[in-house]
Amino acid sequence: LLTGLTPAKHGIVGNGWYERESAEVRFWQQSNRLIQGEKFYEGVQTAKMFWWFNQHAPVQWSATPKPHYGCDGSKVFDIIDQTQCDLVRHLGPFPFFSFWGPNAGLPATQWIADATARVLREKRPELALCYLPHLDYDFQRYQQPSMDRVREVDRCAGVVIDAARQIDAIPIVVSEYGLVPVKRAVAINRVLRQAGLLAVRSGPFGEMMLPGDSQAFAVVDHQVAHVYLADRTLRSEVQRLLEGEEGVAAVVCPDELNLGHARSGDLIALAQPDAWFSYYYWLDDRFAPDFARTVDIHRKPGYDPCELFITSKARAMMRVAQKKLGFRMKMDVIPLDAGLVGGSHGLVNTPDHNPLVIGPDAPEDIYGFARYVRRLLGR
């Protein structure tokens, strides 16, 4: 979207990837410097509101979620507000728990819309980028989500569009993917483990995956998985193994998908249209890592949409009460049932589910979006 380049050139090969030198899987990094290539907003007076890879971006105004972390393991939820608009004072605290997790819903999107409208009116940027996440939630929870969610995000978008028109700006709507119904999960790392290719370490907090000691493992991201190999001579063996697994549509070389980047896996697995990849690598839930039952987007070695669900409200209320009383505890309320997930994305699908641009003389191909914005900016 921002560069007009393919992932092979801009380097963002997924929501996370394996860092080979440190032998760590890193998910949901936010440094803008991870994006390789010129972004269309460089050299333009820009406001970036909750856009991904927002930290340290070369823009004049921005806001992004970022908790404070204490040395005792405590966490205080907050945002980085670099808008000079004092957003929390005017709008109240950002509703972090509705941004992601079992309570993810409308309040976070409404707050972002209101914040963006305020920045538009007060700062009048040449360009503003605003991410409204609301449709990501129920369209992953359910195969047939209520269309009320569309009407809700439409009202939030209206808040931003009204503010844009007040400063004579042109509103553009862009979506990088469409969520499709799914009915089955493929635990690709369990397949690799059962074949003796994936290594784990057992300990007091469950089994931990050891990427650096594994012959093969997968970093999963919705319907796509990067498969990393310790030795590329294993390529044919692993490809045959995974292609024989139910729910896997294809296993290809990254160059075939414009993913030929140093951060990419040695193979790319694609799910069937009605399937998605779970990151699960343990073979018995009794030995699942302690973070598996929590919302922990940075520690999990793969994307986990089960974080949108909850085991039971009673258990969650008990954990909240324990936290308020000062007990040291973990919020282990996330189910280990990948079959709950109702929607996913990542494949090239029908036109109804592909990337979308709405605006005057909008391009049909998403790779033309950066060039389109530059043209609107007169660059």
Would you name each region that the model predicts?
Residues 143-147:
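Short glycine-enriched, charge-decorated loop/helix-capping segments at active-site entrances
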Residues 309, 316-379:
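C-terminal substrate/ligand-recognition segments
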Residues 2-141, 214-219, 223-230, 234-250, ...:
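His/Asp/Glu-rich, glycine-adjacent segments
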Residues 1, 44, 126-133, 149-153, ...:
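Beta-strand elements within well-structured catalytic alpha/beta cores of enzymes
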